[in-house]
Structures are given as C-alpha cells and as structure tokens.
C-alpha cells in the first residue's frame, strides 16, 4: 500500500540493516580521527547565508543550490551546504585560534543542497571531513593523507 506521505525527492532513509553498517562506519571514522588527535566538532544545521556567500562566492554552484529563507526578523538563513565555513566560524568565534595554535577537528554531519536529484546526487547527504587549523606545515598534510589511507583500509 502506498503511503500518502513520501520522503522528499533527493532524501533517503537509513533503515536496518543499513543503519548498522552506517553506525559501524561512523565509529571507525570517529575512532581513527581521535587516534590522530582530532576532536569532533558539531555546528548548527542553520547558519547565516552570508557565511557561505562571502566565503565560497556568490556565483558558485554551492551558493546557487542552497536551501535558504528569511526568518520573521529579516535574517537570511540557510541549511548548511558544506562544512568548512561553519568550522572556521566556530574556530574564530570560540577563540580556539588564541588557545590552540594547532586545532585539529573532524566532523560527520548532514548537509543540504537544492540539487537536481540523480545517481550520486542527493539534496540531503552526509559528509565526513577533517580540518587542521593553524598550521601550514607539510607534515600536517602528510598526517591527513596517512589518516585518509587508514580510514580507507578500515572501511574496505
């Protein structure tokens, strides 16, 4: 029987047994990131639109594909389309740049883009990433590559 209510096109449900695989993958990502000294960061799902427009550009695909609206107070808001800008905003706003010369962060979060749904492209998707803020050392790049290699080996 077809339900009157359907998930929104471009979104998906993570159902058993897939949810068990999903949670296993998340545990591996968290564990390996922490072994390398990265700490998890969570940022709000809603951000000010200017955070993205000013940082990734007004004419980029991401800017054109944001789910945005104006709240009753006139603020232009957006569902997060990517993670680097919110991570850097939190890094600066929290003062971590003063207290942690090298701030190693990782995230696993849901993101949203108003893309035309097709194979490999969803309106809601999840992203894992790491950010090493405050270092321009090549050794930091090597560490990121090593971590990525370990993750790929563990996930198969």
Which residue ranges define each predicted feature?
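TRNA-recognition modules of translation machinery and tRNA-sensing kinases, especially anticodon-binding
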Residues: 1-156
């Amino acid at each position: 029987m077809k339900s009157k209510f359907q998930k929104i096109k471009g979104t998906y449900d993570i159902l058993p047994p897939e949810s068990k695989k999903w949670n296993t993958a998340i545990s591996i990502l968290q564990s390996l990131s922490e072994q390398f000294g990265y700490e998890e960061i969570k940022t709000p799902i809603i951000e000010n639109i200017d955070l993205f427009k000013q940082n990734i550009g007004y004419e980029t695909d991401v800017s054109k594909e944001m789910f945005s609206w104006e709240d009753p107070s006139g603020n232009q808001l957006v569902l997060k389309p990517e993670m680097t800008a919110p991570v850097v905003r939190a890094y600066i706003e929290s003062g971590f740049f003063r207290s942690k010369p090298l701030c190693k962060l990782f995230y696993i979060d849901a993101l949203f883009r108003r893309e035309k749904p097709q194979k490999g492209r969803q309106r809601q998707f999840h992203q894992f990433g790491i950010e090493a803020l405050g270092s321009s050392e090549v050794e930091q790049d090597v560490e990121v590559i090593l971590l990525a290699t370990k993750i790929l080996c563990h996930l198969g």
